Amino acid sequence: MNASEYGDVPQNRERIYIVAFRDKKDYANFSMPLPMELKKTLRDVIDFEKKQDDKYYYSSKNCKFYKELKRDMKNKHTIYQWRRVYVRENKSNLVPTLTANMGTGGHNVPLILTDDNKIRKLTPRECFRVQGFPKEFVLPEQSNTRLYKQAGNSVVVPVIKRIADNIASAVKET
């Protein structure tokens, strides 16, 4: 199940979900959620306008591949990734699958071109938003490296909620 098709989050994240029941009647009443239209956009979960802390921005002073980023990142409405030797634009308007090692190196972190033409990586909060966490979710007091890892290891909240709602309905019917 892809998060963009089953969770209304702009992320390409395919996962297999296994649901089991002890009672065959509950199983007979259960069905996995159906695909849904993606309504949320990148700008619903990522703030392209607001100035973030300087540590999230790339420049010629702190990034050895900044010249390539600057040359190739032109679109302010999409996500980019540094792929070890080249810049990849995700033309699907979806964030690529967030990974647990986003905070440990430069090649897995989704990048954006902000509205004021600055290049930056997603903040931990934005990564959690891409996973479907609500705006008001309070992030734990941890290092950004740990927060990126937690976001990358997370399940997509709306997908899990839809599956759980279907489980509750199946059990309630028996």
Would you name each region that the model predicts?
Residues 1-97:
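Class I S-adenosyl-L-methionine
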Residues 58-174:
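C-terminal target-recognition/interaction regions appended to catalytic cores
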